[in-house]
């Protein structure tokens, strides 16, 4: 089978963020069994060595320059993009990454009959799919998270960067998601929650849930519990949901924990920390570490991994990676989305918390009880091994591509 995968995000190395992790690992699985062509965009910090590394993973690699970021474009262009959003329904964030050169190449590749399947790795790539493609080949969109549900959730939780803009955008995003899904023969979501949201827009659509996975070689189970009072958060630190999570935890939870356990530290590990995150480094016990060569080394040194997400839909790689590494997890409903970790009918695999007092209680329990840490460590790792590997996800994705889901 000849597969054309589209990813405006350069997916290598698969340590930069959640989009890269999911895209690369599904690509890696498919390329072992099929002929895979990847069309992607090169961002400013992508090195020639990284391009060579990605090229080794596919049969054909087509790279295009990423268009200038909207932050560097003029106000007139931004107004034009918003006008197009109102008229045609395509959000400025999608138009911002649109490459005419990439579109021309994709059109030619499809018209020449060089692929049997075309996949969009993240919904932002839907812009390259012409409505008539469905007549020629199977079209798949891999929705990492519903843009409408995410915007609605950010407004509901009060963490929107611009609430007036997002209130205007919300009905437009609903229309956008409904319209773009109609161009695809199959839709993939990461959680049942997202599937329900997307099914509401497109009752007749074929929607398959394929959760994220973990590379168990890159995230081995830790051999010892070092104890102590070390907390960690992992994730790309230019992501709005992650920024909100660490700011919320640092300001509203950590000071209360430190009253009970004064030596508590909080490591924030992940690439591209923005000024709001860097400023947290001035607070007692907080270490903003940035990008590291090995995330698992930092996880293994931690007592607990916290995932205090208040927004952001879809399954969280950070939660799965911590579980794979054998680190006990305390997380919010958003951080545990798509995972059966607690409740009467499930083995206890993580502790759930949403309010500051709930975090204090859960973290205190784990600090004080090594046997509880061991229980979560064992059960979390077992869950990942049996349900959340990239091999399992890759097989499911292959079935969707083959039309056998």
Language model feature labels by segment:
Residues 193, 210-213:
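Carbohydrate-associated surface elements
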Residues 365, 372-386, 396-399:
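A short, well-ordered alpha-helix in the C-terminal region of glycosyltransferases
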Residues 151-152, 199, 214-228:
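Acidic anion/phosphate-binding donor-loop and adjacent secondary structure
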Residues 8, 72-95, 139-178, 236:
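Acceptor-binding helix/loop patch of EC 2.4 sugar-transfer enzymes
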Residues 261-297, 301, 347-349:
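Nucleotide-activated donor-binding/catalytic signature segment of Leloir-type glycosyltransferases, i.e.
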């Amino acid at each position: 089978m000849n597969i054309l995968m589209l990813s405006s995000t350069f997916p290598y190395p698969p340590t930069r963020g959640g989009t890269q992790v999911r895209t690369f690992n599904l690509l890696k699985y498919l390329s072992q069994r099929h002929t895979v062509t990847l069309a992607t965009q090169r961002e400013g910090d992508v090195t020639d060595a990284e391009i060579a590394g990605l090229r080794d993973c596919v049969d054909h690699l087509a790279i295009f320059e990423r268009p200038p970021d909207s932050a560097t474009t003029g106000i007139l262009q931004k107004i034009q993009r918003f006008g197009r959003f109102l008229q045609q329904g395509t959000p400025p964030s999608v138009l911002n990454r649109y490459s005419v050169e990439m579109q021309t190449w994709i059109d030619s590749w499809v018209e020449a009959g060089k692929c049997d399947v075309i996949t969009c790795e993240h919904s932002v790539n839907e812009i390259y799919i012409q409505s008539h493609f469905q007549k020629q080949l199977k079209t798949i969109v891999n929705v990492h998270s519903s843009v409408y549900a995410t915007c609605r959730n950010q407004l509901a939780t009060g963490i929107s960067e611009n609430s007036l803009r997002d209130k205007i955008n919300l009905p437009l995003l609903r229309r956008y998601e409904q319209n773009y899904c109609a161009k695809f023969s199959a839709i993939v979501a990461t959680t049942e929650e997202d599937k329900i949201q997307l099914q509401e827009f497109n009752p007749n659509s074929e929607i398959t849930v394929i959760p994220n996975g973990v590379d168990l070689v890159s995230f081995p189970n830790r051999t010892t519990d070092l104890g102590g009072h070390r907390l960690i958060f992992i994730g790309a630190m230019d992501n709005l949901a992650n920024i909100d999570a660490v700011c919320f935890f640092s300001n509203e939870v950590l000071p209360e924990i430190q009253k009970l356990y004064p030596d508590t530290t909080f490591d924030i590990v992940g690439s591209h920390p923005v000024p709001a995150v860097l400023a947290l480094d001035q607070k007692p016990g907080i270490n903003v570490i940035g990008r590291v060569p090995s995330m698992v080394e930092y996880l293994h040194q931690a007592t607990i991994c916290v995932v205090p997400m208040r927004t952001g839909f879809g399954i969280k790689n950070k939660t799965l990676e911590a579980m794979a590494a054998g680190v006990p997890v305390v997380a919010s409903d958003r951080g545990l989305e798509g995972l059966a970790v607690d409740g009467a009918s499930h083995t206890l695999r993580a502790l759930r918390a949403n309010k500051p007092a709930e975090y204090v209680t859960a973290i205190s329990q784990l600090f004080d009880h090594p046997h509880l840490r061991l229980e979560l460590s064992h059960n979390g790792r077992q869950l990942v091994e049996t349900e959340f590997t990239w091999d399992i996800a890759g097989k499911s994705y292959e079935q969707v591509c083959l039309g056998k889901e």
